[in-house]
């Protein structure tokens, strides 16, 4: 990246190695770099009362990250500020997350976190309060700017590529963003951090829900959604074979944690009836019938750039999943929805995101509404009118 005039970049410094190296590289390239640490979750204000995290760590995980961010900022020689977007996160990300689980869908809060927090609230704060020309994040992605448009490209490190989580960004957001490590592999990023003595060089990658972190998922949800016990039924013979404490804790394709003993075959979750509080399971030998789909209705698609009908479209339903060929991409008139036919995919669930690619470009994504998995077949012709 050439820097003809000194531009101010505000980096989302999280206390992790990726954002640390992003800030370092920008400083080396001649930018005026400012670090900004976000706090977006408050365990007390957000009524998270029964998790071991509160009992043993007393909310210090975020503080430890902040201390690492401070150490990195001092080492690099940049100022570091701190900002809270707790209300914005609750209103735009977490309430949606809860509502989707109450509907027994499988949401992806990381996508909304990027859309509304990292690349909206953070961007606006950096622009308005810190007079930033750009913001930068430690995402494994690339952005290409031309005179009229910006394009989101896959990272060089395909195993770490995070464009899936950026599918809801718009042109205004991308035009103001830099991704300094998108051309590097994770090993290279750690090597750079180690070479320059950054405290985060060997720090493990963060996991769990965006800005909330690692939690026992059932225990965490119980803070906000009451248990709704019900039956587990074998869909093949309609026999009751177990019981559960809530359908929202299980996802399509799940095999672990079903607590079903004495079965001749391993069972997997294939459907859920919210009204009757039933989880349907099937034996592994029925996977093709009850888990494989070839067609889906995708709703509320965000296009980062217009798709080119002459270039093949690929889809990814999960982060790090292999790209799947889309045989038919059929926009539905007067909607932001599209019907897609694709090479077979396993355990695609309503609420997940379908993210579309053409060559190295991530062109956008939308939410899976329905699929044609076995017993869930839908007459999609109705959507073409």
UniProtKB/Swiss-Prot annotation:
Q: Where in the cell is it found?
A: Cytoplasm
Q: Where is the active site?
A: 113 (nucleophile), 210 (cysteine persulfide intermediate)
GO MF term (any one):
tRNA-uridine 2-sulfurtransferase activity
Task: State where ATP binds.
Answer: 12-19, 38, 138
Cellular component annotations (GO), alphabetically ordered:
cytoplasm
Q: Where is this site: Interaction with tRNA?
A: 139, 352
Renumbered residue ranges of the record's region Interaction with tRNA = 160-162
Q: Does the keyword Transit peptide apply?
A: no
The protein's Enzyme Commission number: 2.8.1.13
GO BP: tRNA wobble position uridine thiolation
Q: Give positions of region: Interaction with target base in tRNA.
A: 108-110
Q: Mainly localized where?
A: cytoplasm
Which cysteine residues pair off into disulfide bonds?
113-210
**SUPFAM superfamilies reported for this sequence:** Adenine nucleotide alpha hydrolases-like
Q: Which reaction does it catalyse?
A: S-sulfanyl-L-cysteinyl-[protein] + uridine(34) in tRNA + AH2 + ATP = 2-thiouridine(34) in tRNA + L-cysteinyl-[protein] + A + AMP + diphosphate + H(+)
Q: Name one Pfam family in it.
A: tRNA_Me_trans
Keywords assigned by UniProt, alphabetized = ATP-binding, Cytoplasm, Disulfide bond, Nucleotide-binding, RNA-binding, Transferase, tRNA processing, tRNA-binding
Classification via InterPro entries: MnmA-like, MnmA-like_C, MnmA-like_central, MnmA-like_central_sf, Rossmann-like_a/b/a_fold
In terms of HAMAP family, this protein maps to: tRNA_thiouridyl_MnmA (MF_00144)
The UniProt family comment states: Belongs to the MnmA/TRMU family.
Q: What does this protein do?
A: Catalyzes the 2-thiolation of uridine at the wobble position (U34) of tRNA, leading to the formation of s(2)U34.
Name the UniProt record assigns to this protein? tRNA-specific 2-thiouridylase MnmA
